[in-house]
């Protein structure tokens, strides 16, 4: 449970191990398996402080800038042909993060009727000006990819939608971000290049609920089952009696949220596939 709540406490983890033998595919049409691993590693590494994270991104061939604004943090990692923007997820000892997560009323996102989570929108808009400046300096010759875990996954989705330059988006263990109008419009633009990984019964991916609030997920579901296999099939809907039993296993559902677990499972899926 410690690494769920405090991922950076995992001092033994080696980020991007084997990255030079398994290079990123900057021109891939969407989130290929190897790109999924690179993006998951970036999402995981976003929990580490900049004095460590920047060196580890560099070990994989990326020069990185750290951006922070009132508790919202992201890394902009630049290689010769691509850029990865990775957002840090919720830190339970950060009051602003918890406050952002808790404000789940839907608020307007654009003029087309799309609405999004109030706290997520405000968190994104705190960091948006600095991130926009950083991306503008990079020009247009590199493909841009967004990633994040938990709250970070929600911010990655909002960033892709707002900036409109996403070659690919990865969310791991992400909550729902907006209403049906937002999801429909987002998927029309980026659904084919957005991978939404869900580990087994990760509790965070089920909130905010569809009813009565009207939230919907975006992107292509990539479900990781209890054996670590990845497919597009969601877990079966449980009968009422099974739901009660599952409530007693809340700790298991929280353990499914661990970002390291996502990165390892995504790597294993890539390694098994051979592509």
Give the ranges of each region predicted by the language model:
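Non-catalytic, mobile gating and regulatory segments of ester bond hydrolases
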Residues: 1-147, 151-275
């Amino acid at each position: 449970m410690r690494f769920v709540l405090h991922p950076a406490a995992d001092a033994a983890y080696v980020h991007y191990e084997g990255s030079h033998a398994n290079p990123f595919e900057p021109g891939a049409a969407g989130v290929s398996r190897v790109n999924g691993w690179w993006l998951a590693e970036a999402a995981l590494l976003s929990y580490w402080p900049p004095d460590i994270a920047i060196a580890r991104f560099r070990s994989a061939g990326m020069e990185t800038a750290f951006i922070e604004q009132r508790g919202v943090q992201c890394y902009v990692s630049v290689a010769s042909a691509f850029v990865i923007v990775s957002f840090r997820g919720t830190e339970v000892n950060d009051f602003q993060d918890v406050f952002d997560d808790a404000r789940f009323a839907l608020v307007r996102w654009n003029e087309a009727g799309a609405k999004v989570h109030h706290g997520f929108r405000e968190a994104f808009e705190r960091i948006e000006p600095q991130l926009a400046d950083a991306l503008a300096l990079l020009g247009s010759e590199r493909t841009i990819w967004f990633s994040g875990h938990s709250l970070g996954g929600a911010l990655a989705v909002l960033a892709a939608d707002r900036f409109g330059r996403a070659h690919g988006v990865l969310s791991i263990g992400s909550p729902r971000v907006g209403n049906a109008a937002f999801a429909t419009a987002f998927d029309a633009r980026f659904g084919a290049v957005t991978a939404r990984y869900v580990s087994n019964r990760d509790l965070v991916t089920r909130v905010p609920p569809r009813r009565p609030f009207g939230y919907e997920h975006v992107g292509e579901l990539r479900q990781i089952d209890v054996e670590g296999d990845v497919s597009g099939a969601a877990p079966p809907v449980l009968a009422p009696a099974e739901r009660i039993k599952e409530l007693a296993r809340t700790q298991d559902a929280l353990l499914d949220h661990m970002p390291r677990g996502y990165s390892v499972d995504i790597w294993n899926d890539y390694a098994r596939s051979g592509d």
